[in-house]
Amino acid sequence: MDLTIRTIYKDPARYAGQEVILKGWIRNHRDQKEFGFINLNDGSFFENIQVVYERATTKDFDAVTRLSVGASIEVIGTLVLTPDRSQPFEIKALEVRLIGDSGENYPIQPKRHTREFLREVAHLRPRTNLFSAVFRVRSIAAYAIHKFFQEQDFVYVHTPILTANDGEGAGAMFKVTTLDMNKPPRNEDSSIDYSKDFFGREANLTVTGQLEGEAYAHAFRNIYTFGPTFRAENSNTTTHASEFWMIEPEIAFADLNDNMELIERMVKYVTSYVLEHAKEEMAFFDKFVEKGLLTKLDNLLKSSFKRITHEEAINILLKSNHKFENQPKHGEDLAKEHERYLTEKAFHGPVFVKDWPKDIKAFYMRLNDDQKTVAAVDLLVPGSGELVGGSQREERLDVLLKRMEDMHVPVKDLDWYLDLRRYGGVQTSGFGLGFERYLIYVTGVENIRDVIPFPRTPKNILF
């Protein structure tokens, strides 16, 4: 009977005493004179299964003793329940067949490796416990995001990766060109003549799908995007990467309060789904990565997210008598230490900070009646700070044009965006959730390089 380890863990009693066949990779191997133990993992489940082989009962015993860590094998044996031992069951091997050998220089040996070293062998690191857990949770969380929106009849929109938009201040962009940059065509002023390029104008990798998402919200009402975005920022921090994934919903006929309700429901839904469907992985993170992680996430699910204005947030910080490295100021952004104080000291839970100063926010955010703030919101969570950023969009054409003028946003390039206001425009709201930022929060793994399969960072594109 050809089985997976996951199938056996679901109902070991069903297969007790039966001959089974398993295929997988050796995680650990201990051999002795008359018997030996192999920890086998087949990728279907976080836990390994122990294979016991003996000289008296296992075919080609001596050959089995020479099998290396990392080798792929097929095991034929009997499943035996072992309730009195540390593992609930094991396989008594009748035969162990080598599928693919692994040399002595295999980098992933059964010992502790630094995360820095494992980034250098990113093609092999999912074979470790840590990264097996990380990337299964990544898969489960991604599915949960789609499930959340699909259950509420949101339309999934594939926004373009190649774009003529410059992101309007969202971040430095990667240019895409087919021109020979050693001899590019020039205009009279010596600037590069992009009319000779593939698209006939400058093109970039996208930093956001929001603007295109707004277009589809004006047709389908509720939409979401979930795809890769790119930032050419030369930043080597634990939270920055040049390629990452964003979830960007957009809802029509909706104001900022509707937006905050959607954010809270989505974060709780996805977190609850991960806790339910990745129990072994989450227990591993709680034990070995971030002590108290499960308690933190349980508190998130039970809490009601507080809502305060940016002005109220600054006042709380100023009255706290806490010594901050960066003094909080009205009209300015919140630093990470401010975010953590609000969530961990002031409110002991998640906090929405809304109504931000217009001068530090994007042109498309709706201007409030005070003419000083915009209908923007950030969700702050304990331990991580900002998790989500969003806003109600400016639906009034005249106000939007004035904001674009004040912020020196080229109207000509975004005339199509203005059409959304000219032809049946409505209130829309939306937000952006950096998928990797969420994974950092939910796993406790602190570096963005360790929650992306093949991280892209400055001077690093090995794979």
From Swiss-Prot:
It holds the Pfam family tRNA-synt_2. The keyword NADP does not apply. Keywords: Aminoacyl-tRNA synthetase, ATP-binding, Cytoplasm, Ligase, Nucleotide-binding, Protein biosynthesis. GO terms for biological process: asparaginyl-tRNA aminoacylation. GO terms for molecular function: asparagine-tRNA ligase activity; ATP binding; nucleic acid binding. PROSITE patterns: AA_TRNA_LIGASE_II. This is Asparagine--tRNA ligase. It comes from Acholeplasma laidlawii (strain PG-8A).
